[in-house]
């Protein structure tokens, strides 16, 4: 690697690409994964790893923006922590590299870049997590020092001398916040010491504390179905408002979207609404429920929105009427955006005409306009909601 002057600071070429690189310095071997690190030499035996966040985690970038880690990321970090248990055989340098892989995403959530400063001349700080001021964020610029203290014995206590060394190193390096990470136990006097009034903030983290940190950042499982329902409802509400203002908007909607808009409109007018499935709906698209004279009443709404501008004929009308009668419902409403044929109602009796009402595009627009007024507080539902349905 061409080391010329052991005492001089000399930059080493950046390792580009995504291949695995192995760099040997003296007797130590450092393996670099797929993080595209930049490597610089600061003396004969010491290296510093600067880990850049822009090259990793593309698949979970949304979660990072929301301040969360995916379940897969958290599980991977838990596995790394298992390697740091006191009965493992890692040497101090290997333990630091494992810890670095854990710290990287945890600090990255808050916009920090993690720099590994460990080695023979680490000056008491193994990692520096730095965040620069950003115009797009209110987070202040800050550098946090992290010192690792790992043991191979199953039961080990972190000595007060280690804590005092960390405080001294932090003050010498003008750090205002430091973290001591260990797989050992922190004695009571250590916790008492960090709670005292000091010119810097000190945090003590054992393996359990690290796991708790990961758990807090775990992205909760999203109820996708509920999210979709909310989005569709918001879309339906927006389309209803658009139709109320510009009726021609109906010409640009598919039949299922019109059904969803009508369902949203009737719910906004005070009905309890059930939108039936897109297929095998049993001959009705929307089921409306309301109270009439103290009794529960149920009505079927069928909607025809054919992009071919086809009008509804008598067969479809008779089919809906038959379903209403056979299922003993209180009535129904047939909406057709392009109207009905001239003979669509010829076979209907007076009773049937009373039980089943009809409406075209103008009727749908009127419903949407009433919906907008209701949402603005300019319209209140009548005591008998069927007046809205059959007006």
Curated annotation (Swiss-Prot):
GO terms for biological process: DNA restriction-modification system. The lineage of its organism: Bacteria, Pseudomonadati, Pseudomonadota, Alphaproteobacteria, Hyphomicrobiales. PANTHER family: MRR RESTRICTION SYSTEM PROTEIN, TYPE IV METHYL-DIRECTED RESTRICTION ENZYME ECOKMRR. GO terms for molecular function: DNA binding; restriction endodeoxyribonuclease activity. This is Uncharacterized protein y4cE. Keywords: Plasmid.
